[in-house]
A protein has these predicted regions:
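Helix-centric, low-specificity signal for extended rod-like, repetitive segments
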Residues: 1-2, 19
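Bacterial N-terminal signal peptides that target proteins for export
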Residues: 2-12
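Bacterial N-terminal signal peptides
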Residues: 10-20
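Cyclophilin-like peptidyl-prolyl cis-trans isomerases
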Residues: 22-227
Length: 227
């Protein structure tokens, strides 16, 4: 009797695990099917690129296939914010900025979000993004109170330019997983980390001076691993 219970219990748990894995894959397939793997000297990061930001997806894939990020470095770390990188030769690859594809609030700055860097709004009111510089959000976890306070501060400063209050999903993610909500609606988020968020967070805790890492953190190789 006891053995039978254990077997049935084990089968039930395995079924639940398979169901959760299947749902996770379907969820990722809904946002996009292109995956890029970033091999760093701290570990591997896999990102999924969004289909509804096609300009940035295609631009990133093009640069990756040209080897533009192989041998580059993470050159900027903002604590509780993000880690940023560019190409291995900005003079060779930098070009025109890309038109904004801000799909907000569908895509927001949760931990692991991948977005394009850009100039400040005062010189770039159309919020065009860099064609080479990108960042991955590390962020921090908020309490409901601190998140509401931040939202009010953002509204008072008009940094959201009339965008709606945080959705229930945003509130849940920012208070459980964390992120950088103060960046929402201002930058094009074009992908997210699906594997290796711990590596991203580890890089985000590296020692810095004026947001520059004290130790070199290399990107060994970047490749398109799934389409």
């Amino acid at each position: 009797m006891k053995t039978s219970y254990i077997i049935h219990r084990t089968l039930y748990l395995l079924a639940c695990l398979l169901l959760m894995c299947g749902c996770g894959n379907r969820d990722y397939d809904k946002i996009g099917k292109t995956e890029v793997t970033i091999e760093t000297d701290r570990g591997r990061i896999v990102i999924r690129l969004y289909d509804d930001t096609p300009t940035y997806r295609d631009n990133f894939v093009k640069l990756v296939e040209q080897g533009a990020y192989d041998g580059a470095v993470w050159h900027r770390i903002v604590r509780d914010g993000f880690i940023q990188a560019g190409t291995n030769d900005e003079g060779k690859y930098v070009g025109n900025t890309l038109p904004a594809e801000i799909v907000y609030p569908t895509h927001f700055h949760k931990a692991g979000a991948v977005a394009a860097a850009k100039e400040d709004d005062d010189v770039n009111p159309d919020r065009r993004g860099s064609n080479t510089q990108f960042y991955i959000v590390t962020g921090k976890v908020f309490t409901p109170g601190s998140l509401a306070e931040l939202r009010q501060t953002m509204a008072d400063a008009d940094t959201l330019h009339g965008f709606a209050p945080f959705t229930e999903l945003q509130k849940r993610v920012y208070t459980k997983r964390g992120g950088a909500p103060h960046l929402d609606g201002a930058y094009t988020v074009f992908g997210e980390v699906v594997e290796g968020l711990g590596v991203v967070q580890s890089i985000g805790h590296e020692k810095t001076v004026d947001e520059k890492p004290v130790h070199r953190i290399a990107i060994k190789r970047v490749s398109v691993t799934k389409r």
